[in-house]
Each structure stands twice: as structure tokens, then as C-alpha cells.
């Protein structure tokens, strides 16, 4: 056991985690050169296309160190994006140490900080690594100072490497073996294994990634899931050397995978403890804290026949993604679907894309909203995650919106722009600290503004240099109103949105104008209105298409022309009474983009 090292790699997006893990795998000979490819651990197509890591992956490698010993390295690659920080905390729970990778050109960013604090809270040994020293812009001295200043760990002798060229990666491994402590635990004790992650395989059922804290797990053992009390047979187990390799046993301190022929998706929840049925452990390991979704949106299949398939797909996906929340919802405009909760907009996009790709579904999404706390006049507190669930105005005593605490790190040059953006988003500054050339800003901004497009706009106002980390702080009373969209006098529930009263006029007007461009012209006029309660705040009309009924009249009598026009007018009137308007998917997405183009 003293030769096992469990560690994960934490870093901001694009600081080179995945490339560094490629090099480590190459040096330890996990894959032959023929099988080696860039970002070997980002196995999802989506991860490769966007160049981001979404799911944590684990690898077990053997490394022969300079002291002649052979060490077993279990390492877990983690995502860097703010929406997936819960993946990071799960990976860290299985480790004794973490490599903190910082780009020697970019320096410390908000995500680096957030993940590093998570690691320190869990008492992990953090080993700083300066990556990308081959870049002309690299300034390792400055970045080492930044790490000490901002993060507060000693980085004077931080390992310097370039994962791309392979320089210094050997030193990273040596430092790893030297500084990260071996796992603790009792190999003879009763089995306790932590489920770090699980996913669904069409042939094997549920596959779980586990870390053995105490005891030993052998093939054929009967295992018991501690939270549900159900027992299963350990049919197959093994490790990843990126490839799945079968083993007969997993020893104390190791990380591996386990297949128990669990057919039910909720059979092995992530963060749960496995133990042996014949000799169970007394208590479960501390799990992970449940992550609360921050953004909710309705997802509806385009054709109602896909509803069943959609439900199964969500079930399988939620197994792999503990933070996805969903419940059935029906809408008069879109039929049956699900109200889903996500951690942020990127998470929402990724889930929607995975559903469309991996499960071949066509989906319509409604505008994302956050959860509001509503106190009704009867003093009852309810939580509303969809505009259609908001009680009538006269029943609301107080409406409170979620406030997010946003930590931003940015170069001083962009401070003015970023402050302007925060103020425009109704933010309140709570803290500002200068670290050399960097500024650490803390603002309290309403969650609704953060999830809408704050991240994109922060990046564009700071030319990509600012970085953001946010978490939910509290609910606070606010003057929010529901803006309804009426089409030909009928409310479309899927288009309603909740916004602050000060912005409601503008949002309503912009939305109506956007919709006007997106709804195809019909044979009759379509009136699009935005309303707060019964008060109409904006209107625009999609003009009808008209056939030229006078084309066949040459010269001729005016009364003849009037008769034809009158006849056409009556026909249009009749059409309008029975006509339905089909809304394209773009119309629903228009809400997302309200207020983006005119900035």
C-alpha cells in the first residue's frame, strides 16, 4: 500500500490538464504509441469538439521511480469549467493529493482558485505545477509569485514543465511520488468502497468507478449498497489503463471499476458506500454534498411519440450526471416534456447535445429560469422554478430572487469595463483586492443575471482574461414580474419569462421585436403582445401575405375592385378566427438572446 499514489489534476480551463495526463500515460506506458491520441481521456465526441473535459476519468499506471521502486499511480482527470466543479469535488474525495496545474503564461485564474480551495478543505496535499513553459509569453517567476499571493501555497520550487513538448514531465512524476502521501486504511478491515462515479453501459448495466478505502474486494463477492441495503454480485472488476482491464481483486487504496449487473439506474448512487454482505462495515463513508441545480428549463420532444424514449434517456444520463434533476411537465403549447435542472448554461447545452446525439432525440428547450422563493399572502413559502408556476400577483406577499456571490479575477486594465457590466447586471460590490497586476473582485449579483449571459459578456468585455467562479448565497426580496407573451390574444406559456420590473419594458419590447422577425408570415395578421398581468407593455404585428386580387382587372370600374377587395377581407377575417400559428424552435430560443445584440 505504501507504493500507491492517488491524485487528481486540477486546473482552469485550457491550462493543459488533459495534455499533461496524455504525457503521464505515455511515460508510464499505459498505451502503446499506436493507440496514443491527443486528449486520450476525453472520450466523448462532445468533449473533443469543444476541447473541454466534462466527465472525470480515471487511469491506473505503473511508474518506476528514480529510487528503484515501482509505484502504482491512480489518477483522475477532472473538468475545469465552472459548471462542472461538482465533478471535481467528487474526484478529489478519492485522492490523497492533487496536481495544481497553472499556465505559466496566463497565471492564476478563478477556477484554479476555487478547485484548489476545494482540495485544501479536504486536506489534500497540493503540488503546484507550472505548465506551458515552452510558450514565448511564459513567465514562471511571476506566476509562482501569483500562486503564493493569491492561492497561498509555497510555489518557490514548483515543478516547471511543458506537457506539449514533454519537458519536465518526469520531474512532475518524481515530485508526485515524493510529496503525495500513500493512502491510509486497513487492508484487513471490513470493506468500505466509495462510489466516485457511475455510468450506464448497454451490455453490462451500471458500471461504477470505486475507490477502496478499507478492506479488499474480490471477484464474486456479494456486495451491499449501504444506502439502499440491496445486495449484488461483483461479477467483474478491474482498472483502467485507459483501456478497461479485468482484475480478480481490488486492494485497499486502489481505484477501479466494478460491474454488478445492476439493471436499475438508481441502484448504485454516486457518493454511496459499498461493503461486503457477509461482513458489513458499521458505518458508511461520508458522501458528497448534494448539488442544487441553479438553472431550470423545460425540455420537450419535438414529436410526442418520443416521450418514452426521452424519459429513458434522461434516466440513463442522470445516472452519469448526479446533478441533473428532472420532473415531468406539460405545456399547452409544447405538449408533454420534462422540467430539468442544471448547474449553469454550459451544463444545459451539453446535456441537450448529449441527449440529441447519444439518444437521437429532437428537443425544444424553453428559456432557462432560476428558482424563486415566493411568500404567498397566506404566509406559505413556495419555490418556483418555472414562470407558469408563479401564483397570481394579488396572492404574492413577497417574491425573493436568488443572489449569487461571484468571485472574479482579472487584469487591472479591464477593471472599469467589468465593474460597468456588474452594475448593469444589478450587482453590489462586496470586496476588491489587488494582487500585483491582478484584481480579485467579489460581487453579489442576482443569479438570473449570472446564468443568462454574464459569463459570455464577462469574457468579451475583458478579452477573455477575466475568470469567474460563483456560488449561491441567499434569497433576497426583489421586485420581479412575469412577462407573458400573447399571440393573437392567446397566452403561450412556454414563452413567459420572469424579470425585474425596471427591465421589463425593455425585455418585453425586445422579445416582441425578435419574435416578429422569427414567426413566418401567414395568410392573416398575427398580433404579438407582451403583457404584465393584464397590462400590455409592447406589441408588434406580423403582416399577412396577400394575393393581388386586382391583377385581372384592366382599368375597369372602381366598384368592381372594391367588391373583390371586400371579398378578400372577409376571407381573411374568417381565416383568422380559425387559424393557428406554428411557432418555430427559434422563437423559443429568442428569449435567451434578448438583450444581447443591442449591447
Curated annotation (Swiss-Prot):
Highest lineage ranks of the organism? Bacteria, Pseudomonadati, Pseudomonadota, Gammaproteobacteria, Enterobacterales
Protein name as annotated: Elongation factor 4
**Could you tell me which InterPro entries the record lists for this protein?**
EF-4 (IPR006297), EFG_III/V (IPR035647), EFG_V-like (IPR000640), EFTu-like_2 (IPR004161), G_TR_CS (IPR031157), LepA_C_sf (IPR038363), LepA_CTD (IPR013842), LepA_IV (IPR035654)
The primary gene name is: lepA
Compartments where located:
Cell inner membrane
Cite the PANTHER family for this sequence: TRANSLATION FACTOR GUF1 HOMOLOG, CHLOROPLASTIC, TRANSLATION FACTOR GUF1-RELATED
What Enzyme Commission number(s) does the record list for this chain? 3.6.5.n1
Family statement drawn from the similarity comment of this UniProt entry: Belongs to the TRAFAC class translation factor GTPase superfamily. Classic translation factor GTPase family. LepA subfamily.
Q: Domain tr-type G, which positions?
A: 2-184
Q: Where does GTP bind?
A: 14-19, 131-134
- Give all cystine bridges in this chain: none
Q: Is the keyword ATP-binding in the record?
A: no
In the bilayer, the protein is annotated as: Peripheral membrane protein
Name the Gene3D superfamilies for this protein: 3.30.70.240, Elongation factor 4, C-terminal domain, Elongation Factor G (Translational Gtpase), domain 3, P-loop containing nucleotide triphosphate hydrolases, Translation factors
- GO terms for biological process, alphabetical: positive regulation of translation
